[in-house]
Amino acid sequence: MKEYNYTIILEKEDDGGYHAFCPALSGCHTQVDNYDEAIENIKDAIKLYIESLKSHNEDVPEEDIAIKLIKVVL
């Protein structure tokens, strides 16, 4: 088994739910009611995404994202 590491983004929705997505895997996302469920669901979505790529003999993208928190003062 190969281990994959990906950055995920979790956004709180106006209705209180969460949208989670993996920028390195285009279209890989989930929307659920709570934070913990978002993390579990995006892990499952990533696994399914990678399995689909492999079953179609496609390359699995490498993580190529840099995240930096910046301060903007007005």
Regions found by a protein language model. Give the residues of each.
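A detector of short terminal or domain-flanking linear segments
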Residues: M1-N5, E11, H29
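Short, charged, surface-exposed hinge/linker loops at domain edges
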Residues: M1-Y6, E40-L74
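Short aromatic-glycine-(Arg/Gly/Cys) micro-motifs in beta-strand/loop hairpins
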Residues: L10-L25
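Short, surface-exposed helix/turn micro-motifs that flank interaction/cofactor sites
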Residues: F21, I39-E40
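A short, exposed loop/beta-hairpin motif centered on an aromatic-Gly-Thr core
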Residues: S26-Y35
